[in-house]
Curated annotation (Swiss-Prot):
It comes from the Bacteria. Its main location: cytoplasm. This is Phosphoribosylformylglycinamidine cyclo-ligase. Pathway: Purine metabolism; IMP biosynthesis via de novo pathway; 5-amino-1-(5-phospho-D-ribosyl)imidazole from N(2)-formyl-N(1)-(5-phospho-D-ribosyl)glycinamide: step 2/2.
Amino acid sequence: MSTPTTPLSYKDAGVDIDAGNALVNNIKSAVKRTRRPEVMGNLGGFGALCELPTKYKHPVLVSGTDGVGTKLRLAIDYKKHDNVGVDLVAMCSNDLIVSGAEPLFFLDYYATGKLDVEVATAVVKGIAEGCVQSGCALIGGETAEMPGMYEGDDYDLAGFCVGVAEKEEIIDGTKVQDGDALIALASSGPHSNGFSLIRKVLEVSKADPEQELAGKPLIDHLLEPTKIYVKSLLKLIEEHDVHAMSHITGGGFWENIPRVLPEDCKAVVKSDSWQWPVVFNWLMEKGNISEFEMYRTFNCGVGMVVALPADKVESALNLLNAEGEKAWLIGDIAKRSGDEEQVEIL
């Protein structure tokens, strides 16, 4: 047995506590921007505290967790770290709003082999920006520096969001019925899904991600931050009887819309009601991807679908467009019989 001639430290093993402290100092002002009045205490405690808003008579907590998937691979490779934090919050908070829940607080998990304070600061500032857009507080998180677990500059992210809904007003799809209208809310791009296929298309087509597409680099189309719909949909819920909402994520139209439909209903989507953003046409062409696979993998320009009574379409569209959304009538709900698919795209 041999003994080192000089004392070993945690830093010698690859964990830099001082770098972690520097990160905390860098993000304090960004985190402060996200604070809600219900939050108790400050950043850095063992457990984060948050009261329930007093306006709820029968509050129900709604939780969600998600990541950014292999979109991170492109962000890391092209050193574009500013927006993946927004993506992380969007993937969680957009899931919560589907139930009609108001996001309350968010926690993040950042794991890497060697902590790069500059990169981590950019990521967490993006998380804070996503929280501001969602109206939720960033109340805590974990930065894990784990030498030997990640190669080079690689890191991974996970997010955890908790929201609250009035028990009697939870949106669960049970009110969906034949004749309801379907409204689409535009996406900002691929959002955070389908990136393993996107990377495969880049590989087989040998395309340069820096090439120009419709006035900006292809990589910027691909890494455009996920649209956060929370505030505009909370406003819509407040003023309209929303029957269901579907966040179009992994699984696309075919998998996500049926998650909020009764068994005896199907969604009839009119594909001529919108034009795909150019990046989806590029992916379809360069990857020789079938239309079915496009709708199963990507959002194809639709980030959220809302079902509500047909006579409320005009007022709902006016509200959403006034809130800054690009929204349109994309189809309707019809009766489903036998073994019919629950999504029909015409």
